[in-house]
UniProtKB/Swiss-Prot annotation:
Enzyme Commission number, as recorded: 2.1.1.177
Function: Specifically methylates the pseudouridine at position 1915 (m3Psi1915) in 23S rRNA.
Family: Belongs to the RNA methyltransferase RlmH family.
GO molecular function: rRNA (pseudouridine-N3-)-methyltransferase activity
Family matches, as InterPro entries: Alpha/beta_knot_MTases, RlmH-like, tRNA_m1G_MTases_N
Main location per the UniProt record: cytoplasm
Protein name per Swiss-Prot or TrEMBL: Ribosomal RNA large subunit methyltransferase H
Encoding gene, per UniProt annotation: rlmH
Keywords: Cytoplasm, Methyltransferase, rRNA processing, S-adenosyl-L-methionine, Transferase
GO cellular component, one term: cytoplasm
Localization of this protein: Cytoplasm
Binding annotation for S-adenosyl-L-methionine: L73, G104, L123, S124, P125, L126, T127, L128
Length: 156
């Protein structure tokens, strides 16, 4: 199973790139973690936010390979603790489809992305900076994988 993070935003700070890559490289070859960056729409004083969200959403959905499970990151989504995420990871593997996780931009996700989702996941009731979410996602997914394989990374 391949896990694909599809995130709005490019040109992240060096610490984000390094943090994401640190965890991405730890994933096993049979469960690679891939990042697809979607260019954010230009936001300005008179920006049409609804139109920007629509365009970002179209680009995100176009990046999802046909047949993938779509999981959106959204504050009202389901919250999983680490062990519950490990159970979800196992469930996704048994489903037999690759997984695309959608991370929206500053205004969140387009309605079309939410409508296309098989699941919605909430990392936290807090609003997190989008660059940080990439690193947190990579680490959380790696930790969940480590639980499913009895790897010593996760300690209770």
């Amino acid at each position: 199973m391949k896990i694909q993070l599809i995130a709005v935003g490019t040109k992240m700070p060096k610490w984000v790139e390094e943090g994401f890559q640190e965890y991405r490289r730890r994933f096993p070859h049979d469960m690679p973690l891939e990042l697809v960056e979607i260019t954010a729409g230009k936001r300005g004083k008179n920006a049409d936010i609804a139109r920007i969200l629509q365009k970002e959403g179209e680009a995100m959905l176009a990046a999802v390979p046909k047949g993938n499970r779509i999981v959106t990151l959204d504050i009202p989504g389901k919250r999983w603790d680490t062990e519950e995420l490990a159970v979800q990871l196992e469930s996704w593997k048994l489903d037999g489809r690759d997984v695309s996780i959608l991370i929206g931009g500053p205004e969140g996700l387009a309605p079309a992305c939410k409508a296309a989702a098989d699941q919605s996941w909430s990392l936290s009731p807090l609003t997190l900076p989008h660059p940080l979410v990439r690193v947190v996602m990579a680490e959380s997914l790696y930790r969940a994988w480590s639980i499913t394989t009895n790897h010593p990374y996760h300690r209770e």
